[in-house]
Amino acid sequence: VTGFDTVLNPVIQLKLKQAAEAGAKVVLINPAEYEQHFEFASKIVYVKNDLSFLKEVAKGLLDLGKTSKAEGFDEVAASLASVKAGEDAKEIAALYGNAKKAMIVFQQNFVTTEAAALIADIAVVSGHIGTPRDGILMVKAKNNSQGLIDLGIRAGAEAMQGVKALLVFGEDPEADLSGLEFLMVSDTHMTETAKKADVVIPGTSFASTEGTYTNTERRLQPVRQAVNEEVSFSNWEIAAELAHMFEVEMPYDDTYDISVEMDDQLYKYKYAEVGEIFGGVLAPEKAELKAVGDAKFADPMASTDHLMNVIAERLPKPV
């Protein structure tokens, strides 16, 4: 476990504790300013908030004779030539590298992109990648994050270039939107972003949602409506109505119709059963290692979900 804050994903920490109780050896590597209650771990190492220790672990794997045919391996090995692995790093490299099955768990919006790249290098060089219980578990920030990726929504900031109109659903980003000619916001509260909007459409929260979420391990989790929010449209109905105005038909009567289309369009979901893991093991399509320079280990990203932030503020903080 490397780059982890329990407050962000308490259920994952519980799963790790259960794994330790079942006999798994759990090792925590975290920046010193982010100490965690991991009493169940076999080993805990708190390090500087940089990549030096992870590089020591990577060098420790090379010293064990680990290698890879992946593109970029020679460059990574050369970048680690002057690194000397300390005793803690050697111990962790040996434990991880020699294990029959091993997983690395880290939080997507907690570690830096450079740290994530180095973690991927470590996994590929060790050979622990792409088979059941043998790879990387990148813990997402939100309950719908994995589902969005599966639906093909992967565009980055470059997608905003030249955009003049924006439809924002459930997000409250700290961004300069002054260059837009039109802004629509759909949210549960009058957020700062909503105050700048030309049109605001009341949205519904998770508490009044019907359907499923796809969690980090690709397990379909059903949700049932618990609260009746007095709004004209549910979230999916807002999208369908907007599409209709642009003469794009979304012929759905309910969430079941959406599920049927997902089954038809997305192979991973075709035979997925609620509560079961599906498509959880993905081997790299083309493993490409990347030499990483100096960077921070952790640099947590602020959430752009207003309701999530409100709830987080009211939760009791660990002592």
Segments predicted by a language model, with ranges:
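Non-catalytic alpha/beta scaffold blocks inside enzyme catalytic domains
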Residues: 1-273, 319
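Long, low-complexity segments enriched in small/aliphatic residues
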Residues: 115-120, 255-319
